[in-house]
């Protein structure tokens, strides 16, 4: 055996409703497309048409022998107007969740994954404290309607990416460029997570369940100075890491708000995650307050460095913050020809499992090629190829490798030689 998985270790896949479902649902990403802001002009109303093909996609998951899968629900579908509930949408999601369970797939449900209804966006979204009850009402509705089918929950996906891209750099909706507003959004999302954590446990406990697991998925990367001997660059790297991921991770995990975040609600210190959710993709080199990529490093098709050792590095910091099991809630790569994805997956799993850290789950991003936010459909991360003209699904070579790992509870020598050996990264 080339790589043996520890007992109980699970492999799964991740997806997000706005990236796969399709449909003109009145979300901020539908609006962003109509403003002409998607690089390849892909329309999220098309995406993978998962809303109409969910049975086919769930059957594909079962065909890969997946025991777990992460999915989301689209707020704009469930609440198309403020205070309005679409019971048809709720019934649709319940049917999908029930079918997953029938197939032996345990769902991990994400409540918020970058997508807002436009009515919420027009009110100021998460930048306005008076709007937070709207999100908390949606979260409570999810708990009430799906709590009997879902034990594992992610409250908010990548609050740091949502806030910085939408409110600091202005590349994502709503397109603002304000440091103070970015901090406000982060503070408000931390508040929402803590309230959701408490609510989800209370709601499911009232239903008679004691197996609730709640966390959040944060985007974590390694920040290193371009020149390790340069003290200014080293200090800047530490500052960027804290501003981008350290402060928000601590606030949401423990209720401890430290600069630049403030605890305006006087929330009590506590423990507000049952697992550490890690979304890891790359390492960034730092000279100033902008990302860089180390020279002569392996890169994916978006130019991101491929750095497997960074995954246990970021996870180790979470372990020091709070002793919890670690779930890799996203890890994957843009590989449009599926030329090195199997190697990428193998090397990240190898780095994780040799670390000795309490990794319990690995959710590959993503299940099938999808609408990859600003990049559109041109950036392919999936184990399943999607022909967007016909919506035909085809299992990629990397998907076959993934299924083989699940069947064998690890990577056999034969699988390594068949799928991993010979795959080569592009180096720049």
Regions found by a protein language model. Name each.
Residues 1-54, 58, 62-67, 76-428:
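Non-catalytic scaffold segments within catalytic domains of secreted glycoside hydrolases
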């Amino acid at each position: 055996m080339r790589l043996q998985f520890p007992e109980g270790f699970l492999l799964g896949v991740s997806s997000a409703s706005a990236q796969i479902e399709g449909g003109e649902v009145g979300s901020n990403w539908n609006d962003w497309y109509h403003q002409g802001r998607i690089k390849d002009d892909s329309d999220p109303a098309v995406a993978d048409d998962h809303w109409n093909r969910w049975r086919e996609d769930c059957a594909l998951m079962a065909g890969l022998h997946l025991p777990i899968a992460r999915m989301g629900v689209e707020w704009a579908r469930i609440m198309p107007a403020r205070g309005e509930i679409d019971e048809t949408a709720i019934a649709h999601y319940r049917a999908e969740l029930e079918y997953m369970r029938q197939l032996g797939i345990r769902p991990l449900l994400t409540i918020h994954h970058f997508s807002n209804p436009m009515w919420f966006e027009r009110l100021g979204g998460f930048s306005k404290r008076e709007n937070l009850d709207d999100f908390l009402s949606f979260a409570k509705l999810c708990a009430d309607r799906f709590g009997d089918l879902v034990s594992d929950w992610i409250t908010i996906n990548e609050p740091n990416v949502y806030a910085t891209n939408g409110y600091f750099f202005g590349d994502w909706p709503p397109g603002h460029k304000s440091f103070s507003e970015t901090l406000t959004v982060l503070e408000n999302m931390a508040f929402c997570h803590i309230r959701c954590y408490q609510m989800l446990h209370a709601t499911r406990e009232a239903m008679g369940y004691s197996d609730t697991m709640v966390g959040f998925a944060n985007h974590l990367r390694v920040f290193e100075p371009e020149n390790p001997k340069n003290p200014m660059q080293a200090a800047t790297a530490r500052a960027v890491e804290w501003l981008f991921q350290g402060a928000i991770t601590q606030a949401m995990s423990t209720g401890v708000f430290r600069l630049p975040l403030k605890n305006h609600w006087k929330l009590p210190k506590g423990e507000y995650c049952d697992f550490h959710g890690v979304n890891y993709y790359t390492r960034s080199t730092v000279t100033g307050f902008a990302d860089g990529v180390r020279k002569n490093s392996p890169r994916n098709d978006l130019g991101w460095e491929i750095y497997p050792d960074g995954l246990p590095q970021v996870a180790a910091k979470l372990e020091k913050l709070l002793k919890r099991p670690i779930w890799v809630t996203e890890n994957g790569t843009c590989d449009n020809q599926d030329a090195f994805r199997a190697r990428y997956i193998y090397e990240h799993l190898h780095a994780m499992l040799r670390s000795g850290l309490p990794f319990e789950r690995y959710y590959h991003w993503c299940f099938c090629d999808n609408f990859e936010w600003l990049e559109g459909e041109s950036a392919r991360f999936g184990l399943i190829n999607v022909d967007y003209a016909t919506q035909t699904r085809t299992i990629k070579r990397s998907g076959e490798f993934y299924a083989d790992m699940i069947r064998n509870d690890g990577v056999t020598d034969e699988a390594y030689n068949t799928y991993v050996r010979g795959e080569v990264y592009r180096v720049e």
